[in-house]
Amino acid sequence: SAALAGTITLGASLGFQILDKVLGELGKVSRKIAVGVDNESGGSWTALNAYFRSGTTDVILPEFVPNQKALLYSGRKDTGPVATGAVAAFAYYMSNGHTLGVMFSVPFDYNLYSNWWDVKIYSGKRRADQAMYEDMYYGNPYRGDNGWHQKNLGYGLKMKGIMTSAVEAILEIRISR
């Protein structure tokens, strides 16, 4: 069965093959991204919202992500001859009472910018907005450099992730205990 952005899949099956299919669904658009976030946190997540600083999406965030499942999501630049990238943050309320925030940036102009991404856990319930995006983008984000990165997120959780450097980017993240 084909993977579709806006759905969930078995966490163990998340990988570049599935995310490449998500990219393919976006069609012939440059500046696009397929995102997969594997929930190995021991709890469940409920979608709050996505905030696009630039670009848009054609799908909604999967509403509920149980433990050991992975959410699939995507973003793209606006259609037409516009100089935009796919730049956003999205948020999930976690069953531990905190919020998982994810930020990605696939810029239009690679002469000035690079692919960037980050993950952060916020205390309590918090929707994604410009402030959340800026907190992660201007904090200490990871470059989309085709390399794996990991960090302790606090609250007993850690993350490991990778983002490609391409204009058709893939971002794969695993949240675990």
From Swiss-Prot:
Per the UniProt record, the site (Interacts with the lipid membrane) maps to 143
What processes in GO biological process is this protein linked to?
Answer: cytolysis in another organism; monoatomic cation transport; pore complex assembly
Q: Quote one Gene Ontology molecular function term.
A: channel activity
Its keywords, alphabetically, are: Cytolysis, Ion transport, Membrane, Nematocyst, Secreted, Target cell membrane, Target membrane, Toxin, Transmembrane, Transport
InterPro entries (UniProt xref) = Actinoporin_PFT, Anemon_actinoporin-like, Cytolysin/lectin
Q: Quick one: where's region Trp-rich region, which is important for the binding to lipid membrane?
A: 105-120
Keyword Nucleotidyltransferase tagged: no
Q: What is its main location?
A: secreted
Region Plays an important role in the hemolytic activity, as annotated, extends over 3-12
| DNA-binding as UniProt keyword | no
Q: Where does phosphocholine bind?
A: 54, 87, 105, 107, 133, 137-138
N-terminal region: where is this region? 11-30
State the family it belongs to. Answer: Belongs to the actinoporin family. Sea anemone subfamily.
Subunit structure, briefly? Octamer or nonamer in membranes. Monomer in the soluble state.
Miscellaneous notes: Hemolytic activity is 3.6 x 10(4) HU/mg.
What does this protein's UniProt record list under function?
Answer: Pore-forming protein that forms cations-selective hydrophilic pores of around 1 nm and causes cardiac stimulation and cytolysis. Pore formation is a multi-step process that involves specific recognition of membrane sphingomyelin (but neither cholesterol nor phosphatidylcholine) using aromatic rich region and adjacent phosphocholine (POC) binding site, firm binding to the membrane (mainly driven by hydrophobic interactions) accompanied by the transfer of the N-terminal region to the lipid-water interface and finally pore formation after oligomerization of monomers.
Protein name from the UniProt record = DELTA-stichotoxin-Hcr4b
Q: What is the lineage of its organism?
A: Eukaryota, Metazoa, Cnidaria, Anthozoa, Hexacorallia
